[in-house]
């Protein structure tokens, strides 16, 4: 019986991989991160995959099931040579995400959605114009309070972008009372999810899924696969790089005068390269007076 179940999974996974839609990532920001890259795709044993899922299913607030499509996307992400660098980078951003998750009383595992959205690139910009760690479209971002000008783009501000994402996700969950549907709506909009629910005549995500746009059909399984990878990467001998700082090590300050990035970094006792990394929202070498910044020290 076990042999036949394995064959069924293999057939399902093969069919899924032939039809899968991949979430595209711009990972150029990872080039500056020193760390060991995966040299060849990692083998993902089906039985180990199922075994590792059991404790997650018990503690995971968002439903995580042992479905072939999730296994398929897990294999895909464990084939990316950069996955270890993203795991390392998460140690820098996740304390910020956890802080905002606590503030808005959301499930902690929602933070893995940012990997799907941007691979933790604070300046990520999609072909359709979505921006930042959590990939806000201009209209949605404007509604959530994200602004920009020639000097600053608050879409790229890690804290502002994350705060807006948590508020928006909370609104979507309150609308659907189902995290998989809320996550789908984050990707394709509530209107498309509502339409899919009407066509499916149910609000069960796995039955609604086939009526969603193609990319959104891949979105939730990708999120669940990434969650699995982040919880179990040690089992696959992935060695993420270690960062010296976390985003929450920086204090929030408002500049009292204008200056160059180099000058402002010196005023706030922060190495220039660290200051630039912590403040991707600053677009030029000029920092206007009254700019909210993140620094290691006070002026």
Annotate each language-model stretch with its function.
Residues 169-196:
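Catalytic and binding regions of secreted/periplasmic enzymes and modules that target cell-wall glycans
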Residues 106-123, 182-187, 275-279:
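Short, functionally critical alpha-helical segments immediately adjacent to catalytic or ligand/cofactor-binding
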Residues 15-105:
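An acidic, Gly/Ser/Thr/Pro-rich helix-cap/linker signature
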